[in-house]
Amino acid sequence: MSTPHNEANKGDIAKTVIMPGDPLRAKYIVENFFDDYKLVNQVRGMYAYTGTYKGHKLSVMAHGMGMPSVGIYSYELYKFYDVENIIRIGSCGGYKPELKLFDIILSENVFSESNYALTLNNEDCHVTSSNFELNAIVEDTAKEYNIDLTKGNTVCTDCFDVYMTDVNQFLGRVPDGFNPVSAEMEAFALFYNAKLLNKKASCLMSVVDSKFITDVATAEERETGLNNMIKLALDSAIKF
């Protein structure tokens, strides 16, 4: 069964899906890491692929930018395609001075001022969490491959935080003690959908900019320079 946003048939999607934001990153992943693959969705250019990685069936599907976009695609995967696990892999802004470009962050809890939960489910919810079980597998896999991993909380915004008139005013509205290490624009909707539909979600992010460093990742680096994060997600996913 297809949806208005996904032409894949139900059996075309694996139980575990890796979700980058960028469709070109989805293409890059299957072309460079999968044993074999097929394109199962290209509606609106939001590519989805299913294939095998180290002999295990996995899917990779892009989710676009922002909570409404990832909210639609992840909801449909969980609800209509019987997906059980989603790992979002994306970019983020670093909020701690010790973080460097391309450091990998595992998001534990997410705060958002969005009304996503209220609109979708009539719940006034602004903090939600990733799945502990999936996160534990990711942590163990990172140790196995000697990949440095920073765990912490994330703020999820409705606009690119770099463009905020005053980011400190926004941070002043973050709950006391939340202490975010990163900022991005999608994880809240993904985690909330997983909670609502009794599924599992995790989120890995690579730092591509920070107010503490002058360097920023180029568009090309954002597409292809995240290989450690990609490998970590894939090698974790085959253990779910």
Describe every region a protein language model picked out.
Residues 127-177:
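Active-site rim beta-loop-alpha module in soluble metabolic enzymes
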Residues 36-42, 146-153, 240:
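Flexible, glycine/charged-enriched surface loops at secondary-structure junctions
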Residues 137-145, 193, 232-240:
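Generic non-transmembrane alpha-helical segments
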Residues 1-137:
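Metabolite-binding pocket within alpha/beta catalytic cores that recognizes anionic/polar moieties
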Residues 23, 93, 155-161, 189, ...:
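Glycine-rich beta-alpha junction loops
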